[in-house]
């Protein structure tokens, strides 16, 4: 198998260029009732003007037809082959909220959910506020401390999300998610995928029943779905591989966790897109690579809220000048996967990609949307090749071979 990162590392010639990777989570979509996607419907004069000066294309996050999770989707655009580096959502969420994870620990991402009888009727418990969710996490910590010889600790995340950490001997992460992924389905318990994870299966399934018992009197957050069981993985450092000083700007814990896992510096920022873009400006001289994450495009796609997804795209466009005035040598606008509103979830569809640089061919595309990207100069490429293009457009790659 070709080791892309090793080849790139040998070709890199550092310079003073600056690269910005703007990820609008779940940006790709399919036409709605009026025949337009949210990107087409949105009023985006800055993105469209940028498209005229850029090379456009689309990415395949993992393989054609494969629907990626957020972890594989991001690893791909960071240049890590998601088929080689398989990482559970739990470790990403845990690192994103600064949970310390050791070699005896097994972590999982939790969603508070609403249960009627044994049927999941809301996988996100009505999207409670982070403050409401934290109170329920406290109830869990007060009532569940240990299962057999395994210590249990819960940590609040953002909105309906939390992290559970199990600490003990012989815990492994080859496990199915304890999440049916759809509403209207019964409780799903985890199942070990190999013999080494049988103990983990037993402990987690007892834990699920304990959570159900403890939360039975809660109105909406009366159950929890657990997924992304994971140990701490070791990944090559992004900075070392690409000879860059990388920084990450994200609001949601999981994406901070992803960035931290590959060795990016996590910058403090506010809650809005404007705050995030201003954080880039404030730190412009300290780093030469900025990963900026916008979450709500994905959230509204999952909710099936077409108009709200349009508004988030327009908010990105409204504030894009904050990035453009910095005059980055390379500005990449893309997503980690598609989240069509009609499907209310991640999908297999290719992801729009736009790369701005003074070295682009430009001239073919007039707008930034799925269909302009599909016919763009970059073609359809694996997401794992985005970083090599970023480095090339930044003038950081030497010639390969004689």
From Swiss-Prot:
Q: Which GO terms describe its molecular function?
A: metal ion binding; phosphoglycerate mutase activity
Pfam families this protein is in?
A: Metalloenzyme (PF01676), PhosphMutase (PF10143)
Gene Ontology BP annotations: glycolytic process
Q: Which Gene3D superfamilies match?
A: Alkaline Phosphatase, subunit A, Metalloenzyme domain
Listed InterPro entries? Alkaline_phosphatase_core_sf (IPR017850), ApgAM_prokaryotes (IPR023665), Metalloenzyme (IPR006124), Pglycerate_mutase_ApgM (IPR004456), Pglycerate_mutase_ApgM_sf (IPR042253)
Keywords tagged on the record: Glycolysis, Isomerase
Q: Which family does it belong to?
A: Belongs to the BPG-independent phosphoglycerate mutase family. A-PGAM subfamily.
Q: What is this protein called?
A: Probable 2,3-bisphosphoglycerate-independent phosphoglycerate mutase
Please give the organism: Thermosipho melanesiensis (strain DSM 12029 / CIP 104789 / BI429)
Origin organism lineage: Bacteria, Thermotogati, Thermotogota, Thermotogae, Thermotogales
Q: Which gene encodes it?
A: apgM
């Amino acid at each position: 198998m070709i080791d892309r990162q090793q080849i790139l590392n040998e070709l890199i010639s550092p310079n003073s260029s600056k690269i910005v990777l703007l990820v609008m989570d779940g940006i790709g979509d399919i036409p709605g009732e009026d025949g337009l996607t949210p990107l087409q419907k949105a009023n985006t004069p800055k993105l469209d003007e940028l498209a005229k000066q850029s090379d456009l294309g689309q990415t395949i996050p993992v393989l054609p037809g494969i629907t990626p999770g957020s972890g594989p989707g991001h690893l791909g655009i960071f240049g890590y082959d998601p088929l080689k580096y398989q990482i559970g959502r739990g470790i990403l969420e845990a690192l994103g909220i600064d949970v310390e994870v050791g070699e005896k620990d097994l972590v999982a991402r939790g969603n508070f959910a609403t249960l009627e009888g044994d049927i999941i009727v809301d996988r996100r418990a009505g999207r409670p506020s982070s403050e409401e969710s934290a109170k329920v996490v406290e109830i869990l910590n007060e009532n569940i401390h240990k299962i057999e010889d395994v210590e249990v600790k819960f940590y609040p995340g953002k909105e309906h999300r939390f992290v559970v950490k199990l600490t003990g001997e012989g815990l492994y992460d080859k496990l199915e998610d304890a999440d049916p992924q759809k509403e209207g389905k019964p409780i799903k318990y985890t199942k070990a995928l190999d013999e080494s994870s049988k103990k983990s299966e037993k402990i987690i399934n007892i834990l699920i029943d304990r959570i159900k018992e403890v939360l039975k009197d809660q109105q909406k957050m009366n159950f929890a779905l657990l997924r992304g069981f994971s140990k701490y993985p070791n990944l090559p450092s992004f900075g070392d591989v690409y000879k860059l000083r990388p920084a990450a700007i994200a609001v949601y814990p999981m994406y901070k966790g992803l960035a931290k896992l590959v060795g990016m510096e996590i910058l403090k920022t506010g809650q809005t897109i404007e705050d995030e873009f201003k954080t880039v400006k404030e730190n412009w001289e300290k780093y030469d690579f900025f990963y900026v994450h916008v979450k709500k495009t994905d959230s509204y796609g999952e909710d099936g809220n077409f108009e709200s997804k349009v508004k988030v795209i327009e908010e990105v466009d409204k504030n894009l000048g904050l990035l453009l005035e910095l005059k980055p040598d390379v500005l990449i606008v893309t997503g980690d996967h598609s989240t069509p509103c009609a499907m209310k979830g991640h999908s297999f569809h290719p992801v729009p990609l736009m790369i701005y640089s003074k070295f682009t061919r430009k001239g073919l595309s007039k707008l930034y949307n799925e269909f302009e990207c599909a016919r763009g100069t970059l073609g359809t490429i694996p997401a794992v090749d985005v970083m090599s293009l970023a480095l090339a457009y930044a003038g950081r790659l030497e010639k390969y071979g004689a």
